[in-house]
């Protein structure tokens, strides 16, 4: 995927405001028993422009590791073609981790670690922490979870929620990332305050209103 440069794309934002989008496919959800079998990553700037080429790697797993998949995961990975690619792959998890770290080094400021971004990323972060600790250390402890925005849209602006772009449900890592970036772009257009945003005075008024509303809980 090449860097987006057209008249409809916001200017590329500062290097210290990058987001690292990672999606994993695993053999299951048990950190100790299951393994990572696909790693995809893209870096965007603050305006959600995709920067350069990303990472999209299938990681080899042994037959014993594949046997740990339950029926649901087995069917999902077989239907997507991932299982066959896992068996054919010679890529190790360390090599996949190295590739993501190289992507981060190329596009992000090491003095300002970028947050991990994605959809429902708590499980991905847990597997990163357990199985790719160097990558975990390279990321900011904060995360940008698009599913949090989705849940707020459902409660505050149901029309926004129900009109979100449809997902392909490919259950492949790179496709999932692109869909997550696209979804956040949609929410930014439909849900958030349009640029240039509120004035400083409006922000101050809103902050005071929030303080006043919840002041009784601090008495």
UniProtKB/Swiss-Prot annotation:
UniProt EC number: 3.1.15.-
Active-site positions on this chain: 141
KW Hydrolase (keyword) present: yes
SUPFAM superfamilies: Ribonuclease H-like
Keyword terms: Cytoplasm, Exonuclease, Hydrolase, Nuclease
GO cellular component: cytoplasm
First-listed, main subcellular location of the protein, grouped into a coarse class: cytoplasm
Localization of this protein: Cytoplasm
One term of GO molecular function: nucleic acid binding
Highest rank taxon of the organism: Bacteria
Functional note: 3'-to-5' exoribonuclease specific for small oligoribonucleotides.
Official protein name in the record: Oligoribonuclease
Native organism: Corynebacterium glutamicum (strain ATCC 13032 / DSM 20300 / JCM 1318 / BCRC 11384 / CCUG 27702 / LMG 3730 / NBRC 12168 / NCIMB 10025 / NRRL B-2784 / 534)
């Amino acid at each position: 995927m090449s860097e987006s440069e057209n008249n409809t794309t916001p200017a590329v934002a500062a290097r210290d405001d990058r987001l690292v989008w990672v999606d994993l496919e695993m053999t299951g959800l048990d950190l100790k028993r299951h393994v990572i079998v696909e790693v995809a990553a893209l870096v965007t700037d603050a305006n959600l422009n995709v920067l350069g080429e990303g990472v999209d790697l299938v990681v080899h797993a042994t037959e014993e590791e594949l046997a740990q998949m339950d029926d649901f995961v087995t069917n999902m990975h077989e239907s997507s073609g991932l299982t066959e690619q896992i068996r054919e792959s010679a890529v190790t998890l360390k090599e996949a981790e190295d590739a993501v770290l190289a992507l981060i080094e190329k596009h992000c400021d090491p003095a300002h670690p970028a947050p991990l971004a994605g959809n429902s990323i708590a499980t991905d972060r847990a597997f990163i922490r357990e199985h790719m600790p160097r990558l975990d250390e390279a990321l900011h402890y904060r995360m940008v979870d698009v599913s949090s925005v989705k849940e707020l849209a459902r409660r505050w602006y149901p029309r926004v929620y129900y009109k979100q772009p449809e997902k392909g449900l490919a259950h492949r890592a790179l496709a999932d990332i692109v869909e997550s970036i696209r979804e956040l772009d949609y929410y930014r257009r439909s849900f958030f305050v349009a640029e240039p945003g509120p004035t400083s005075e409006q922000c101050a008024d809103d902050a005071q209103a929030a303080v006043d509303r919840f002041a009784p809980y601090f008495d």
